Every structure is written in C-alpha cells, then in structure tokens.
Regions:
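N-terminal capping/small domains of soluble enzymes
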Residues: 1-101, 106-108
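Short beta-strand/loop segments at the ligand-binding rim of alpha/beta enzyme cores
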Residues: 19-23, 97-102, 163-173, 239-248
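Glycine-rich beta-to-alpha transition loops that act as phosphate-gripper elements at the mouths
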Residues: 29, 104-107, 172-178, 227, ...
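Catalytic cores of alpha/beta
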Residues: 34-35, 115-119, 177-188, 251-268
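Glycine-rich phosphate-binding active-site loops on the catalytic face of alpha/beta enzymes
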Residues: 49-50, 54, 133-135, 196-202, ...
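C-terminal helical cap(s) of enzyme catalytic domains, especially alpha/beta-barrels
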Residues: 60-69, 205-218, 273-296
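Glycine/Thr-rich beta-alpha phosphate-binding loop at enzyme active sites
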Residues: 72-73, 136-150, 182-243
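Short, positively charged and aromatic/hydrophobic N-terminal segments
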Residues: 320-321
Length: 322
C-alpha cells in the first residue's frame, strides 16, 4: 500500500517496472501526444507507440476504420512518420510525461528492424521496444515473420543483437497453428516479454455496392469478438514459456483485465475501447478498488484457473466500461 491508503498496483515485466498493469496498445493511442489533453498519461502503466518504420509510410487508402457489431476493423496500413522523425519531433515531448514509453517497431526485412532499433537505441526517453512481427518478410515471398518458429527466432535474434539498453517485447500473431511453439522460439531467441496477440484478418462488405467497407479491402478485427480466442492463446502461451505475457484483445471492463491475469498474463493492453468511448483508459484506476493481495495472487496463478476461488474485490465494475 502506498501513502493515503492507495492500492499499489506496480509490477515488473522482466526488468521493466510499470506503475500498474494497464497499458495503451499500439495503433490506438497514436504517439501519445494526441491523447495528452484527455488522458493523464502518468496514470497509465505505460503506452505503446504506433508502429515505427525505417522510412515514413503514408498508409492505406480511406476508409480505414469500420465498426462491427462486436468490435472494429482497421486498415490503417501502418502509417507513421518514420523512426528518425519520431526521435526528432515526437519523443522530446513525450519525455516530459512520467510514464513508460514503449516503441513499437516493424519492418519488411531483418535489416529494417535492425536499423530502426539502432536509431532508437541512441535516443533517450524510451522504456523498451515491442516488435511487431506480423509483417510480411519480403525476402521469403511475403510470409509473415510470425508464422513459423525459425522466422520468429531469426528476427528476435537480429533485434537482440542491437538492443542492449532496454527490454525487448515481441508481439505475436494469432494466425499460427501452435502459439506455444512460436512463444518458445521468441523466448529462446531473447524476448524479454510477449504481447499476445495481434488483430485477426477480417472483412466487412456493403452488400448494396458489393464492395468492401475498407479502402484496403481487408483489415484487422479487434474488440470483444476476439477476446475468447485470445484468452486461449494467452493460456496456451503461458503453458509453453516462463517469459512474462501481456494480453491484448477485447479489454473493455475490469472483468476483462482480471480474466487475462487469471490465464497467465502479467499485464494487459487496451486498444479498441479507446475508440469506442470518450472515457479514457486511465479512468479504470479511479473507479477500481482491488485487494492488493488478490492482484498478486492472480499474477501468480499462471495458467491454472480456478474460478471457485476467485475472490477479487471489485467496486462498481458492473456499470463500468472504458
């Protein structure tokens, strides 16, 4: 317990200490600055920047977002200013906020990942990195880096070779036959933590025109629809590795957070919920009153779930979403 009787929800993901287990997910929080007037960034456990590439990317054609009955489709196309512009223009402002800033990194070749990380390693103000390995490897016919253990190990080892200062998280794809094998490959190659998981390829059609509702034809499905599937992935990954896991997919309520902790995640990221409500994710920490002992118990449960023994004390969760 901290002063004034406040519950201390701080934790460590590997070597990285977070104020609490709630982070803003990559792609839904921009560079953080866009939400600074709405969200007290210091109240978040941290936030993950939108993906950073070697060179600027304009992204996919509009429309880029499409709401579904149970979530959202996005096809932003990884638009970003490029790593050098991020370091020169965005990061100096972000350094003013007392929160963990995790840079999401992607590429289409091993050299892309290495170059982006080299630039970031020379910059101050970052707490760690998250590798998005769901991108196509252009040197292997467009096959995703995340699709097989050998490719995963290759890209993580390449990243690890240039990352000395900060923790390295790896964001896994849900489109794999055995998430345990993929998770183990990332762990053995040097990942400090795993983010499980990315969005699911999907589509929405306007039957009146016969055309996709997205400019890029297909997009990534996120939101409540994917939570049960991703919970299973976290559970399977937890059985395969000892590396900390950050759960991501359909987190909207206090119960969602606790569900992810119960199947073995150490923390969660909130994404689509940031688009669907005006109440910022940091509000969770204002209305949530959790027994410190029970949070620790959930964090130590790993993948063994016993719902009959769940005794977490939640205040007002029944009417709260964020």
């Amino acid at each position: 317990m901290s002063s004034a009787g406040a519950v201390d929800l701080s934790l460590k993901i590997g070597a990285l200490r977070l104020r609490n287990p709630i982070l803003a997910a990559s792609g839904t929080f921009g560079y953080g600055l866009e939400f600074a007037h709405l969200v007290e960034l210091e109240r978040l456990g941290g936030f993950v920047t939108k993906g950073l590439s070697r060179e600027p990317i304009e992204g996919a054609p509009a429309p880029r977002l499409c709401e579904t009955p149970s979530g959202m489709l996005n096809a932003v196309g990884l638009q970003n200013v490029g790593v050098r512009a991020f370091v020169a223009e965005k990061l100096p402002v972000l350094r003013k906020f007392d929160t963990a800033i995790i840079a999401n990194v992607f590429g289409y070749t091993l050299e892309d990942y290495v170059e982006v990380l080299r630039v970031l390693e020379d910059a101050d103000g970052l707490a760690g990195y998250e590798l998005n390995i769901s991108c196509p490897n252009v040197k292997r016919g467009g096959m995703q880096f995340a699709s097989d253990p050998a490719s995963v190990a290759e890209v993580v080892r390449a990243a690890r070779s240039v990352v000395a200062k900060r923790p390295l998280w790896v964001k896994l794809s849900p489109l794999v036959t055995d998430i345990g094998l993929i998770a183990r490959a990332a762990e053995e190659a040097g990942a400090d933590a795993l983010t499980v998981a990315n969005t699911y390829p999907a589509m929405a059609i306007d039957y009146r025109t016969g055309k996709s509702r997205l400019g890029n034809q297909t997009g990534g499905l996120s939101g409540p629809a994917i939570k049960p599937i991703t919970l299973r992935l976290v559970w399977e990954a937890r059985k395969a590795v000892k590396t900390p896991i950050v759960g991501l997919g359909g987190v909207e309520t206090v119960e969602d957070v606790l569900d992810y902790l119960a199947v073995g995640a150490s923390a969660v990221q909130v994404g689509t919920a940031s688009f669907l409500t005006r109440r910022p994710v940091s509000d969770l920490l204002r209305v949530l009153k959790v027994s410190f002992v029970d949070v620790i118990r959930l964090l130590s449960m790993r993948y063994e779930v016993n719902f009959s023994q769940k005794t977490v004390d939640i205040m007002m969760f029944s009417c709260y979403t964020f």
